[in-house]
């Protein structure tokens, strides 16, 4: 009898006669025999503690199993129970505002059961709370005798003020409605809809299961055309992502990957967030758990905690290595489920490097042929199959709806080396690359995104959208990028011969580039006025900086040889204007769009007037 005998276990609920026996144990990899008829990726329970495992290789009646829990204490001859199903997640009300481990065990519920801070081995508790009664409202258009198929919405549950949970027919089910439950409060296991197909009746509840390694079906993938607004000026203006896009954030330790991931979770224009902490420090998840409940978003006149639209999957670095792979798949399956309701979901994976390291460790124990840096040869294929589950799609079922999953994957290359196999493979897959720079981070320039190596392939897809919002934005962005590139080209000359040897036009370029770097690209994520920058503020800041640059260049170019205008003259005469331009970031968005627009518009007019007066003086 195991020492956790008082806890719910698998054997007490789903034990099966099909059983094999452990042959060998090597860390998280267990080899068992007498498992003829088992399937690849079938879930098994290993040992007397019934540890969760997954079959990853089959040879005759011998199976190689990766175990998602600590394997110390397993011995040769221990039983291995088959479950006849793959690793699945439970999908239904109660996912949001919850924290799971890599195989969707609810950490809050386990803490209440065990009254401790550790997860006992082999514990088998339902992922979603079966005792809560949810207010269910059936779809009034459906009636007995109607035909339904996978993806059809037959009711809804108001999970909280941010998420209205649509209850759907599971993707592989279909039939004729025999019975419909009336509106009321029900638990997850209560039958809400009874359907009949081919003479067999099936009762549908609020919850259904889905295998994590299979993508949920869709009608078709659609082109992405709406930006994912992050609240970070450098990302929204220079390297935008779309809802349904794929992004990578590679960077060395201390560059701010986690802060960017967390600010995306806090301030992006997504309807739901799935945050997967995959192999990172436990303190980072603790930080999220402490900060998120205090953050609020406005819904109508009320403030609501953003934790209500967030689901956390925590698989920290001290948890079993094999479960890191499962946590990524668990996260993306949860995200696809909310996408099928017609929501725009953002999934943060922090970090995919730790997942790749788990693949490398298990691959090594399986004695597979190593490729670059010891990673398995199928690393690129695994990464691609994960990122390909992102996208904007037309969902199956009725009524027709469009949803999206955006994947933002943080990558931690050792020593910040972007030639690392994981970073190189990720770069070939993703459409947006936000490269973090150690030197910028050391200069305390945050977010430390290097504007010279980062890129976004969604620029053209979003140009139509930007033209509708503000026709001036695209030319402004192009001009700002040119100035930053020119500054980089001039920096070598400045280092060799000094800034005084440059022409006046180049001096203006260098100074305006410095203003863009320090007062536009740099952003204090911990200040109330700058933690989130709305898009209108970003555009106005860029507009005023470019207006100043264009007028300064014009003043220098139009001056005559005997009355040459210099940068020093402009700087001395327009000191107050330059100070106001550099102080634009201090305008607080909570004052409202009208107030800020009026302020920036006045500044724009003042810049034009100041240069007009300056040219009259000269």
Swiss-Prot record:
Binding-site residues, ATP: 251-258
EC number: 7.1.2.2
Pfam families in the record: ATP-synt_ab, ATP-synt_ab_N, ATP-synt_ab_Xtn, ATP-synt_VA_C
Sorted UniProt keywords: ATP-binding, Hydrogen ion transport, Ion transport, Nucleotide-binding, Translocase, Transport
Keyword Flavoprotein among record annotations: no
Gene3D superfamilies reported in the protein's UniProt record: 2.40.30.20, 2.40.50.100, Bovine Mitochondrial F1-atpase, Atp Synthase Beta Chain, Chain D, domain 3 (1.10.1140.10), P-loop containing nucleotide triphosphate hydrolases (3.40.50.300)
GO biological process: ATP metabolic process; proton transmembrane transport; response to bacterium
Matches recorded under InterPro entries: ATP-synt_VA_C, ATP-synth_a_Xtn, ATP_synth_asu-like_sf, ATPase_a/bsu_AS, ATPase_F1/V1/A1_a/bsu_N, ATPase_F1/V1/A1_a/bsu_N_sf, ATPase_F1/V1/A1_a/bsu_nucl-bd, ATPase_F1/V1_b/a_C
Alphabetized GO MF terms: ATP binding; ATP hydrolysis activity; protein-containing complex binding; proton-transporting ATPase activity, rotational mechanism
Keyword Nucleotide-binding tagged: yes
Family: Belongs to the ATPase alpha/beta chains family.
Subunit-structure text: V-ATPase is a heteromultimeric enzyme composed of a peripheral catalytic V1 complex (main components: subunits A, B, C, D, E, and F) attached to an integral membrane V0 proton pore complex (main component: the proteolipid protein).
Protein name according to UniProt: V-type proton ATPase catalytic subunit A
Name of the coding gene: vatA
